[in-house]
């Protein structure tokens, strides 16, 4: 069985996709995003899945997407912000090189505007984001082998910090 070089976790808008693509380039490997896997397989946006089928149905799809990607992908893998909510998914991450990209709420506002395209943040986005982070922070920390703060850093700086944190050398 193969395993990803690095798995990225963290809240929505933290930069997992951007940093993941930069990491893949610097390591000379592929990049994969489980949210994109779900969108491709379902033929619709994640927000539509939430509206049409509910969060529980989405989390089931997400769990399977993560399981498949962990088994198939050998490069850099980015997980959706809520993937770590599932205990089985957290168990699958044991033994993986997992980097938790963190940010505070002010950084989240700057990066995402905490906009309505985020289905879990549709009402009072700042309050919702804080509550999500209070519920998830310890789960991100539990699965992480390294934590990289992204606040005030460029994607390139975060990428270098992630490489340094997991002691990987560029290709």
Swiss-Prot record:
<dbReference type="GO" id="GO:0000287">
    <property type="term" value="F:magnesium ion binding"/>
</dbReference>
<keyword id="KW-0418">Kinase</keyword>
<comment type="pathway">
    <text>Metabolic intermediate biosynthesis; chorismate biosynthesis; chorismate from D-erythrose 4-phosphate and phosphoenolpyruvate: step 5/7.</text>
</comment>
<dbReference type="GO" id="GO:0005829">
    <property type="term" value="C:cytosol"/>
</dbReference>
<dbReference type="GO" id="GO:0008652">
    <property type="term" value="P:amino acid biosynthetic process"/>
</dbReference>
<dbReference type="GO" id="GO:0009423">
    <property type="term" value="P:chorismate biosynthetic process"/>
</dbReference>
<comment type="similarity">
    <text>Belongs to the shikimate kinase family.</text>
</comment>
<feature type="binding site">
    <location>
        <position position="118"/>
    </location>
    <ligand>
        <name>ATP</name>
    </ligand>
</feature>
<dbReference type="GO" id="GO:0004765">
    <property type="term" value="F:shikimate kinase activity"/>
</dbReference>
<keyword id="KW-0460">Magnesium</keyword>
<feature type="binding site">
    <location>
        <begin position="13"/>
        <end position="18"/>
    </location>
    <ligand>
        <name>ATP</name>
    </ligand>
</feature>
<feature type="binding site">
    <location>
        <position position="17"/>
    </location>
    <ligand>
        <name>Mg(2+)</name>
    </ligand>
</feature>
<dbReference type="InterPro" id="IPR031322">
    <property type="entry name" value="Shikimate/glucono_kinase"/>
</dbReference>
<keyword id="KW-0963">Cytoplasm</keyword>
<feature type="binding site">
    <location>
        <position position="81"/>
    </location>
    <ligand>
        <name>substrate</name>
    </ligand>
</feature>
<feature type="binding site">
    <location>
        <position position="153"/>
    </location>
    <ligand>
        <name>ATP</name>
    </ligand>
</feature>
<keyword id="KW-0808">Transferase</keyword>
<comment type="subunit">
    <text>Monomer.</text>
</comment>
<dbReference type="InterPro" id="IPR023000">
    <property type="entry name" value="Shikimate_kinase_CS"/>
</dbReference>
<dbReference type="InterPro" id="IPR027417">
    <property type="entry name" value="P-loop_NTPase"/>
</dbReference>
<feature type="binding site">
    <location>
        <position position="59"/>
    </location>
    <ligand>
        <name>substrate</name>
    </ligand>
</feature>
<keyword id="KW-0547">Nucleotide-binding</keyword>
<feature type="binding site">
    <location>
        <position position="136"/>
    </location>
    <ligand>
        <name>substrate</name>
    </ligand>
</feature>
<protein>
    <recommendedName>
        <fullName>Shikimate kinase</fullName>
        <ecNumber>2.7.1.71</ecNumber>
    </recommendedName>
</protein>
<feature type="binding site">
    <location>
        <position position="35"/>
    </location>
    <ligand>
        <name>substrate</name>
    </ligand>
</feature>
<dbReference type="GO" id="GO:0005524">
    <property type="term" value="F:ATP binding"/>
</dbReference>
<keyword id="KW-0479">Metal-binding</keyword>
<dbReference type="Pfam" id="PF01202">
    <property type="entry name" value="SKI"/>
</dbReference>
<keyword id="KW-0057">Aromatic amino acid biosynthesis</keyword>
<dbReference type="GO" id="GO:0009073">
    <property type="term" value="P:aromatic amino acid family biosynthetic process"/>
</dbReference>
<keyword id="KW-0067">ATP-binding</keyword>
<keyword id="KW-0028">Amino-acid biosynthesis</keyword>
<dbReference type="InterPro" id="IPR000623">
    <property type="entry name" value="Shikimate_kinase/TSH1"/>
</dbReference>
<comment type="function">
    <text>Catalyzes the specific phosphorylation of the 3-hydroxyl group of shikimic acid using ATP as a cosubstrate.</text>
</comment>
